[in-house]
Amino acid sequence: MTINLSTTALIDKIAQDLGFTEISNLTDSILIKNKELISIATFLKNTPKFDFQMLVSITAVDYIEYFEIVYHLLSIQHNQRAILKLRCYDRESPSVPSVVTIWPGAELQEREIWDLKGIQFTQHHNMKRILLWEDFKGHPLRKDYLR
């Protein structure tokens, strides 16, 4: 059985090694700032203590006031899981950094989130629709989507 990594230990190590202190502990996950995503993701993948080589999934939740992007990470080496979350408060043109350069498996998942929720992943090399046709208007899984 895979063990959920202690969020407190994870936050402490990130704060110690990267100096990021504005990280919130959400019981089973950590909430990070958008601008810190790439640094933290790279750190979690490349630090032997964590070794999160696998991005299991990315999803997005529309809470109306903000979008929450959720990253599920897995370390096969340590048999541990971790969940990163970040929030995007811009409904007009939401965007977050792409993690494709860190975890190539993020490519299709980021495109799906763009297609259905309208969240742009900056620095993504192929940000186009994946499920709907290019001329489709809007993003149908947004709570403010109207036909």
Please report, for each region that a protein language model flagged, where it lies by residue.
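Terminal low-complexity/charged segments
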Residues: 1-147
